[in-house]
Amino acid sequence: MANTIKASVVQASTAAYSLPDTLDKLEKLTRLAKERDGAQLAVFPEAFIGGYPKMSTFGLVVGDRQPEGRDEFVRYAKAAIEIPSPAITRIEQISRETNVFIVVGVIERDAGTLYCTAVFVDPEKGYVDKHRKLVPTAMERVIWGQGDGSTLPVLDKSFESASAPGSTVNTKLSATICWENYMPLLRTYYYSQGTQIYCAPTVDARPAWQHTMTHIALEGRCFVLSACQFAQEKDYPPDHAVANASARDPNNVMIAGGSVIISPLGKVLAGPLLDAEGVISAELDLDDVLRGKFDLDVTGHYARNDVFEFKLREPPATSS
């Protein structure tokens, strides 16, 4: 059991598009994961920084765009962060002070385009990389650009063993955002790079999401850490769109959560957490990855490279 680390998944919402308040919340929840559960890795939801504009229309119908929608986009874009930026510096500070590796969903602003991004922050190295969501889903395409093949990192990371202090645990981790998880070739790429800790920031609180996460854990023989937002009307600005405008209630649930940690053999180690903000944690035995690959390695002994060919088309690197 020397090959273990402690990981936490945070289920929470953006603080009403307030960057300072959201960063304070990130610090509070990271410290909770560390102090209560001994977390070495903490995964936060999709769009935790910048916010997920659930129910927003941005003044759009096919063939027309309203001025109020443009104003809403301005407000949303101003809540996004650049990379690098003082916000990234603050996350680096939180990571360093808590000694927790942080994976967090952000809305990234690059000139006039927004991206749904996951950033990786190391307690020793600071910001180390990012992944931009390849395909925003449905109306998300109105506000977010598409990532490309230059931001698909699978990171090598060493942790001190949680069960044998002084020993080192070497692992590989990645992040796949929300419905990207339904892209078989993207999953195949991450499996081919040896991901062992598969982070899945999301806002999908549907029951079927649990089946998706279990499937990926089994298919990839990896730990799946899915962090979903839990959000209520009070977590959004007062004039934000809601499902039923005639029955506004600050406690109405907008995003119900469902954060979960699943082992490479499909066992639920923590969660799913529903209808509440919180932190779930588990001790991950990285040897379970090899135990799983004994009978299934979809890009190794269970692949047929003589029948199928897989290739990543990697463009020039984007701005950091």
UniProtKB/Swiss-Prot annotation:
Q: Its domain of life? A: Eukaryota
Q: One Pfam family for this entry, by name?
A: CN_hydrolase
Keyword Metal-binding on this protein?
no
Q: Write the record's keywords in alphabetical order, separated by commas.
A: Hydrolase
Q: What class of enzyme is it?
A: hydrolase
Q: Which reaction does it catalyse?
A: a nitrile + 2 H2O = a carboxylate + NH4(+)
Q: Which InterPro entries match?
A: C-N_Hydrolase, C-N_Hydrolase_sf, Nitrilases_CHs
Per the UniProt entry, the Enzyme Commission number(s) are: 3.5.5.1
CDD domains noted in UniProt: nitrilases_CHs
Annotated active site residues, numbered on this chain, are E46, K133, C178
Residues annotated as domain CN hydrolase: 5-286
Q: Which GO terms describe its molecular function?
A: nitrilase activity
Q: What does this protein do?
A: Nitrilase that hydrolyzes preferentially fumaronitrile, while 3-phenylpropionitrile, beta-cyano-L-alanine and 4-cyanopyridine are transformed at much lower rates.
The similarity annotation says: Belongs to the carbon-nitrogen hydrolase superfamily. Nitrilase family.
Q: What is this protein called?
A: Arylacetonitrilase
Give the gene name.
Answer: nit
